[in-house]
Amino acid sequence: MISIKKFKKIFKIIAITIILVFLGYVGVYLYAKSLDKLPITSANSFYMYDNKKNLFEGTNDEWISIDKISPYLINATISIEDKKFYKHHGFDFLRIMKAMFTNVMNGKNLQGASTISQQYAKNLFLDFEKSWKRKIDEAFLTMRLETHYNKEEILEGYLNTINYGGIFGIENASNYYFGKSAKDLSLAEASILAGIPKSPTNYSPISNYDKAKERQKIILESMVKNKYITENEMKEAYNTELTFIGSKSEKKSSILMYYQDAVLKELETINSIPTSFLKTGGLKIYTNLDTNAQKLLEDRIKENIDSENELQISAVL
């Protein structure tokens, strides 16, 4: 049980922080408004090569306008990532205060409060460094986006560049996972895809189906709470059996997908480069993968293991 003295101290810290944040917000807003627009064109691709320097993975920039994206996907994303997106000017101060209080009370960083605008600014222009300078840069860039672009433009850019499990942009992701355009996504499909950006490796429906379904349930419940769908629609979507084209695609095997995710994860954890930044960097990534031997290995597995068998086999050369 927290003491009254400690509670007053925490309250004082939060109150002072709120005042400073507000004053800083006004100053940044006025300065950002006086500057020119930031360029928010489609980001560069990343390219991944095998041990013989042959390209086996590269993202294509399929930028689509917001009116060509399923309303289910848009509403699912807003519900789970930033439910006040259309109401705030780049920052959700109530959410920030709640996150600060939770983190101070627990003594660790348990809860984030980034809006879609903040995430987009971070993904486009910043690296993975964790510092106060980076936080200030993020706030400033967010304000520049908000002062020069409308909500539809920001959301369109965000959805066209975000990481969906190694597939960047909603049109690429929709085609990869379901073999269809983003405008044709059903509620069940959209709620699965909207859950991936939070943690692309953990919530990929191909590599972590159970976790992806847990995330989907949270998103659907959030959509009901925000009155985007009914409870019956939620239940129907959750119980819909989905077929993921990506896991059976001739273009990219599921094992290669795991390999790509592992490489991106290593770059993120060991080299401090986030997967989202890889999209904007236009990086060329050279690996030790032997694609010929890998294909031979996978063919042998397919010949000897029934696709319906519950036995799970994975190997990378």
Predicted segments, located by residue:
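Juxtamembrane regions of bacterial inner-membrane/periplasmic proteins
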Residues: I2-E308, S314
